[in-house]
A protein has these predicted regions:
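Short coil turns that delineate tetratricopeptide repeat
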Residues: 73-75, 112-113, 147, 180-181, ...
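Residue at a conserved register position within TPR or TPR-like alpha-solenoid repeats
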Residues: 50-53, 88-89, 126, 160, ...
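Eukaryotic alpha-helical solenoid repeat scaffolds
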Residues: 1-35, 39-42, 184, 190-303
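TPR alpha-solenoid repeat register
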Residues: 45, 78-81, 117-118, 152, ...
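Structural register within alpha-helical repeat arrays
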Residues: 48-49, 84, 122, 156, ...
Length: 303
């Protein structure tokens, strides 16, 4: 079976890109008559195609992808079991059906408590059922078993933040960075949570740390729009009249904050301008580009 599709296309998070890919699913899957053949990369692409089809409601093609993976790796393969669970969740008609999925996960975990894909599906399902405290408990149990899962630490941070537990969210992301210190997206996410917390009594210190993490994010990825967006916001907080520079010597001065702010805005302008005329970038990050332009407009109006 030949290569199905460019990996950059199937990894796109935008719904339009997913829809475009899923519409091609019947033709792409039809090329793979020999279900036992194929490279690991091609089966990874089938998995991404499966996710795109589920996201766009093409359940039939998603089932075909799942059958292909199950035939190749076996239905007892943990990754396949996780995808099967995702399919059952996505096609569930009501809450009762979702509760049945949860019961199925509990049964699987009673036989193998460290089935990671099922553990993660269970967490995701608890979140979708608005059982946030149960999801937090489940994630803590997962991390007790696998403390080096940076993705799980990040998800735990999101749950804590949703519950208004900012300190716990910050701790969770700091743990994630111990595992993945060069993950620019995690640095940016930590910067965002610190920025949100900067309205507290400890605001000066948190705002300063927020700027530091956004700077690290764009140092690691020099065209990361989210990092520059956050740096523009966080540096503006340091420039506000009511901000007092903390005694902490690592806090940037007003002059440094001003330079960082101007730099972030200029890079945002450059990124928005270049990506807005690129169809591929526009399709995959339209919402981010619109938000960045809105932020630029806001600062221009206030200057």
């Amino acid at each position: 079976m030949g290569a199905l599709v460019d990996a950059r296309e199937i990894n796109g998070s935008d719904l339009i890109a997913a829809l475009h890919l899923s519409q091609r699913a019947p033709g792409l899957l039809g090329k793979g008559a020999d279900k036992s053949a194929g490279t690991a990369e091609e089966y990874g692409q089938i998995e991404q195609l499966f996710l795109a089809c589920l996201r766009t409601g093409d359940d039939q093609s998603a089932q075909t992808c799942l059958d292909r993976l199950s035939h190749r790796f076996g239905p007892s393969n943990e990754r396949v079991m996780g995808l099967q669970g995702l399919y059952q969740e996505a096609t569930a008609k009501d809450r009762s059906a979702l509760e049945k999925c949860l019961a199925d996960y509990d049964k699987i975990l009673s036989e193998n408590a460290v089935n990671v894909p099922i553990l993660k599906r269970r967490v995701a399902l608890l979140r979708s059922l608005n059982r946030t405290s149960d999801a937090i408990t489940a994630l803590i149990q997962l991390l007790d078993a696998i403390p080096t899962d940076a993705e799980a630490w990040c998800e735990l941070a999101d749950l804590y933040q949703a519950e208004g537990l900012g300190a716990q969210a910050i701790f969770s992301l700091e743990e994630a960075l111990l595992i993945a210190p060069n993950a620019w997206n995690i640095h940016a996410r930590l910067g965002e949570i610190l920025y949100v917390g900067a309205s507290s009594s400890d605001g000066a210190r948190l705002a300063s740390k927020s700027v530091q993490h956004f700077c690290r994010s764009i140092e690691l990825c020099d065209d990361y729009l989210r990092g520059f967006y956050g740096l523009a916001l966080a540096s503006s907080r340091l420039l506000s009249p009511d901000y007092e520079t903390p005694s902490n010597s690592t806090a940037p001065s007003k002059q440094t904050a001003e330079r960082l702010h101007r730099f972030a805005l200029q890079r945002l302008r450059d990124i928005v301008q270049s990506r807005s005329v690129d169809d591929q970038h526009w399709a995959s990050s339209r919402s981010e580009l619109i938000a960045a332009q809105a932020l630029l407009n806001r600062f221009e109006q206030s200057s």
